[in-house]
Amino acid sequence: MSEDSSALPWSINRDDYELQEVIGSGATAVVQAAYCAPKKEKVAIKRINLEKCQTSMDELLKEIQAMSQCHHPNIVSYYTSFVVKDELWLVMKLLSGGSVLDIIKHIVAKGEHKSGVLDESTIATILREVLEGLEYLHKNGQIHRDVKAGNILLGEDGSVQIADFGVSAFLATGGDITRNKVRKTFVGTPCWMAPEVMEQVRGYDFKADIWSFGITAIELATGAAPYHKYPPMKVLMLTLQNDPPSLETGVQDKEMLKKYGKSFRKMISLCLQKDPEKRPTAAELLRHKFFQKAKNKEFLQEKTLQRAPTISERAKKVRRVPGSSGRLHKTEDGGWEWSDDEFDEESEEGKAAISQLRSPRVKESISNSELFPTTDPVGTLLQVPEQISAHLPQPAGQIATQPTQVSLPPTAEPAKTAQALSSGSGSQETKIPISLVLRLRNSKKELNDIRFEFTPGRDTAEGVSQELISAGLVDGRDLVIVAANLQKIVEEPQSNRSVTFKLASGVEGSDIPDDGKLIGFAQLSIS
């Protein structure tokens, strides 16, 4: 008598899974549908490249343990995990309805979004289920950290579940709600990211998810996050320096917003308060008037899933049948290929693959609507140098009024590095470097001028900011804000020749912030 497949434990043998279409991708991972033969069930497998993942295996295992302990109807079920070569495979439940983002894209592509993408009843129904899932996570001492439409999945029965496709978005506190639950890990997607996550000064807690939830509410109505058109550093700058976004932010055709009422707008504004302490909890939001409009899953099944693309429409086909655990590469045309270094070129498979016309490889780059490009989605902790001002003059005394001249060391200067790499190439396309001065105070309260060059097309704002930190010239906590303002200047140097901005590192002791004297502030100028 054959054993009931449902009673079998989930296999940790790679050969028991037949990999199928690619249904999602990020900077360090690919999500594929797969068929588990022993269980006779289709699943989703997230394949994490451990070489790119900067989180230690110990930390990953802790997070997987936290995922395995999540049992809630609004959280995607985790089945098992195992290592295949240099990849960690996470086996999870496959929801055939796809993500809410898939539905949004489908509606927009068909031009059915002129009066708003989803109606209030649909939004309320989806978001109420998301809140139920978030309330469960938060009560169990976990922060999701990447709430957005792309991580909200639908089952064929109209059920709604939060996916954790960021893997380490879960950080367990051992279920002890009394423990310190403040994180300082830079994880998430810029458009949905809370200001306190960007600043990394005081850390953040569960309220970061509430901000992302508010942005997601806007996304479900308008089809996109408020700052989706801007590059990542611009998003960071707008989020930190502007008033919180609203339903109207970034929307050109205001007609599409007319059907959205006061309770919806009020709910969004409650979530998008810059002070996290003023944001409601998930439990408090569930009692908000707007969610009285929510209906049941049969409503979603009938009204929303009928407008959703099928799994075959969503899927990205793989050019070669995956016969091994080779690496996948995204190509210029959006397709997927298995890497050539995973098979024998003299084999029949190798000869066949080489003889085929293949799309050119492209460097990995993730759009702003997906992931922060220079930050691994599996949380990288920003390291603040122990001696922030090691390379700066250190005399004792009161706040200085005249700046000390400091240059970025040649070994760390991005423009010089780029020139060294291209020396002898004879390229005529080299852009003229922009000479800049960053004026700020060191830990001894001395005013310093840090001079450096930025070469458009070669340097990046993030890279230069990191070089300044590595050289001990800038506090590590100011990485984001310095990069954001540098990006602002190099994008429009004619209109932004000088900017003064508040530093995330703040002021020491009894000092009072002063933008004129640059106490707690910095000034970046074109010299």
Swiss-Prot record:
PTMs per UniProt: Phosphorylation at Thr-185 by WNK kinases (WNK1, WNK2, WNK3 or WNK4) is required for activation. Autophosphorylated; promoting its activity.
UniProt note on regulation of activity: Activated following phosphorylation by WNK kinases (WNK1, WNK2, WNK3 or WNK4).
Annotated EC: 2.7.11.1
GO cellular component entries: cytoplasm; cytosol; extracellular exosome
Record key words, sorted: Acetylation, ATP-binding, Cytoplasm, Kinase, Magnesium, Metal-binding, Nucleotide-binding, Phosphoprotein, Serine/threonine-protein kinase, Transferase
Main location: cytoplasm
Effect of residue 448 to A: Decreased interaction with WNK4
Consequence when changing residue 450 to A: Abolished interaction with WNK4
SUPFAM superfamilies attached to this UniProt entry: Protein kinase-like (PK-like) (SSF56112)
Keyword Cell inner membrane: no
Swiss-Prot/TrEMBL cofactor(s): Mg(2+)
Bias type Acidic residues, positions: 334-348
Biological process, per Gene Ontology: cell volume homeostasis; cellular hyperosmotic response; cellular hypotonic response; cellular response to chemokine; chemokine (C-C motif) ligand 21 signaling pathway; chemokine (C-X-C motif) ligand 12 signaling pathway; intracellular signal transduction; negative regulation of potassium ion transmembrane transport
Location of this chain's protein in the cell: Cytoplasm
Active site: 146 (proton acceptor)
Tissues expressing this chain: Ubiquitously expressed in all tissue examined.
UniProt GO molecular function: ATP binding; identical protein binding; ion channel regulator activity; magnesium ion binding; potassium channel inhibitor activity; protein kinase binding; protein serine kinase activity; protein serine/threonine kinase activity
Keyword Mitochondrion tagged: no
Residue numbers of N-acetylserine PTMs: 2
Positions of modified residues (Phosphoserine): 324-325, 339, 347, 359, 427
Function: Effector serine/threonine-protein kinase component of the WNK-SPAK/OSR1 kinase cascade, which is involved in various processes, such as ion transport, response to hypertonic stress and blood pressure. Specifically recognizes and binds proteins with a RFXV motif. Acts downstream of WNK kinases (WNK1, WNK2, WNK3 or WNK4): following activation by WNK kinases, catalyzes phosphorylation of ion cotransporters, such as SLC12A1/NKCC2, SLC12A2/NKCC1, SLC12A3/NCC, SLC12A5/KCC2 or SLC12A6/KCC3, regulating their activity.
Family: Belongs to the protein kinase superfamily. STE Ser/Thr protein kinase family. STE20 subfamily.
Protein's name according to its UniProt entry: Serine/threonine-protein kinase OSR1
Protein species of origin: Homo sapiens
Gene name, Swiss-Prot/TrEMBL: OXSR1
